[in-house]
Each structure stands twice: as structure tokens, then as C-alpha cells.
A protein has these predicted regions:
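Transmembrane alpha-helix signature in integral membrane proteins
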Residues: 93-123, 231
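Transmembrane alpha-helical segments of polytopic membrane transport and secretion proteins
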Residues: 2-55, 304-315
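Glycine/proline-centered hinge or cleavage motifs at structural transition points of membrane proteins
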Residues: 148, 207-208, 221
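Transmembrane-helix boundary motif in ABC transporter permease subunits
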Residues: 109-141, 154, 162, 305-310
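Transmembrane alpha-helices
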Residues: 211-248
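Generic hydrophobic transmembrane alpha-helix motif, especially the helices
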Residues: 142-179
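C-terminal transmembrane helix and the adjacent membrane-cytosol boundary/short C-terminal tail
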Residues: 124, 191-194, 205, 232, ...
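Interhelical loop and adjacent transmembrane-helix boundary motif
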Residues: 87, 245-294
Length: 315
């Protein structure tokens, strides 16, 4: 009796277990297969993204490592203190003339571009935002930003070197460089000022302030981090230009002594020309110039971050 009772109980338990188990429908199978397909697609996209990132960053990081490593190992005190010696296929010495020429060209170009760019950005953002003149300025700036740098260099050659008779000089090269940097500064200045809320301007005007006071004491302070970032970005871009300076500044092994009728040396020329010369000394100077350019650009970017954080806390 007990045996039959246990057999019947086990049969009932087994039947209940079979009944309680859910049956797998075609919908469940479709959902499962769709989930597996999505996971497979997600893995494929992630793998493809990683491959693309590596394909882009590996050549760039390899070049940076080569320039930084070779330049840092070759650079010495004489690189900064001695000018370049020789010409044509044989060169030696240091890069004092190119370093001073680069700083002089950047000083002239950035001074003109910053003054005109910031004032132009303030005008079209604060005083004439929707006027026809502002729209014309924006259109001209966009067109100027799209002009190749070598075309700007040739125009500078015809206008400054030939027509005005300045010759190959620091002033001709610096002004040509300022035309190249100007669009970046004016557009970033306008964008930085536009990010300031209109409520701030309206509150200041409600207290009796005029437009000039609002701009000088309020909106410029709020937009200063963005303006500084745009200025340093334009300087970094101008630092890497060679084509405009080939037509307007030429190159010289001597430290610049005058703003007119005096060719100027600069680091990008050393990288562009000396790397194609057959001598090992020329290649050494090219690597050292590359290292100095990278160091200056990194310093400018670091300074931009520090200044932006500092002025952001102040405002």
C-alpha cells in the first residue's frame, strides 16, 4: 500500500512539474535570436571603433614620439644660442635665428589679429548682431577662413613685398600671418559673447547701464575664457604655417635686425626645407625645430587651460 501511495505521489509531482514549465513559443525564440543578434552587432561595432581609433592614433603617436624623442636627444644649449650656419645642401649651427624670427612673426601677427578680431567679434555680437553689415562681415570671414594659406601668402607677396616695397621682411610676414589668424579669433569671440545669457544684459540695462558699459564690465568678463581659448588656438594654428611666410618672409640665417627689407628665419621653414636636404646636420636641425614647435604648442594649450580655469573662477 505504501509503495503504491509513493508511486502515485511521484507521478502527480512529475505531472505537475511538467505542467508548470512554460512552453517556449515562436515569439520567445524570435526575441532570443534578436537579442543575440544585437549583442553580436554591438561587439562588432565596438571592435570596429577600436580598430579605427588605433589606425588613426598609432601613426600620429609614432610620429610625435619620433619627433619628440629625436629632437629632445639632439637639442642642446647651442641650439638656442647659435644661429644657423651655411646654406643649400650643407647647414649646421643652431636655431637662434629661427626661434627669434618665429617669436617676432607671431608677435606681429597675433597683435594685429587679436586687436581686429576681438573688436570685430564684439561689434557683430553686441552692437550689430542682425544688421546687414554684420551678416556681410560674417560672410567675408567665412570666405577668408576657407582661402588656402598659400594663396594668402601669394597675395601678401604681391601687395606687401612688391607693391608697397617692403621686401621680404618680418612686417610683411607678420601681417600676412595675421590675416590667416583673424577669422578664428573673430568667430570664437562672437561665439563666446553669444553664450552670455541675454538676461544678464537686460538686467544691466535695467539698472541704467549703456551698451558700452555692459560690454566692458559684464559680457566681456563672462566671455573672456572663450576668447582666450580662441586667441591661443589661432596662435597655435599660425605657428604651424609655412606657405604664407615662404612668399613674404623668405628665410635668413641671421637674427632679424629690422622690420622691413630684412628676411626672417622661422622654425617651420627649417622643418620643411632642412628635412629634404641630404646632410645629417640638416636632419638634426629639422628634428630639433619639430621638437621646439611641439613644445611651444603644448605650452600654449596648457596655458589656455590654466587661464580658462582661472578666469572661469573669477567670473
Amino acid at each position: 500500500m505504501d509503495t503504491d501511495f509513493h508511486r502515485n505521489a511521484s507521478k502527480k509531482t512529475l505531472s505537475n512539474t511538467i505542467i508548470d514549465q512554460p512552453t517556449k513559443t515562436w515569439y520567445d525564440s524570435a526575441v532570443t535570436s534578436n537579442y543575440k543578434l544585437r549583442r553580436l552587432r554591438d561587439k562588432f561595432v565596438k571592435s570596429f571603433t577600436i580598430v579605427c581609433v588605433v589606425a588613426v592614433l598609432y601613426p600620429l603617436s609614432s610620429m610625435l614620439y619620433m619627433f619628440v624623442y629625436k629632437g629632445a636627444t639632439l637639442i642642446s644649449l647651442s641650439t638656442i644660442t647659435q644661429p644657423t650656419i651655411g646654406s643649400s645642401s650643407f647647414v649646421s649651427g643652431g636655431l637662434a635665428n629661427a626661434i627669434e624670427g618665429t617669436l617676432l612673426l607671431l608677435g606681429i601677427g597675433s597683435s594685429v589679429a587679436v586687436c581686429l578680431g576681438v573688436m570685430g567679434g564684439v561689434y557683430i555680437a553686441e552692437f550689430s548682431r542682425n544688421s546687414r553689415l554684420a551678416k556681410g562681415i560674417r560672410f567675408g570671414v567665412d570666405v577668408l577662413a576657407g582661402v588656402p594659406s598659400i594663396v594668402l601668402g601669394y597675395v601678401g607677396f604681391l601687395l606687401l613685398v612688391i607693391y608697397f616695397g617692403w621686401g621680404y621682411s618680418a612686417l610683411a610676414g607678420g601681417l600676412t600671418l595675421s590675416v590667416f589668424m583673424f577669422p578664428y579669433i573673430i568667430r570664437t569671440t562672437e561665439l563666446a559673447l553669444r553664450k552670455v545669457p541675454d538676461e544678464v544684459r537686460e538686467a544691466a540695462k535695467a539698472l541704467g547701464s549703456n551698451n558700452a558699459t555692459v560690454v566692458n564690465r559684464l559680457t566681456l568678463r563672462f566671455a573672456l575664457p572663450g576668447i582666450i581659448t580662441g586667441i591661443l588656438l589661432a596662435i597655435s594654428i599660425g605657428l604651424g604655417e609655412t606657405a604664407p611666410l615662404l612668399y613674404t618672409a623668405s628665410f635668413s640665417n641671421y637674427v632679424p635686425s629690422a622690420l622691413l627689407q630684412s628676411p626672417v628665419g622661422y622654425l617651420t621653414y627649417v622643418v620643411y626645407v632642412f628635412s629634404q636636404l641630404p646632410s645629417a646636420e640638416a636632419h638634426s636641425l629639422a628634428y630639433q625645430a619639430s621638437f621646439l614647435l611641439i613644445a611651444i604648442i603644448v605650452t600654449l594649450n596648457f596655458a589656455a587651460r590654466v587661464l580658462v580655469q582661472r578666469f572661469s573662477k573669477v567670473t
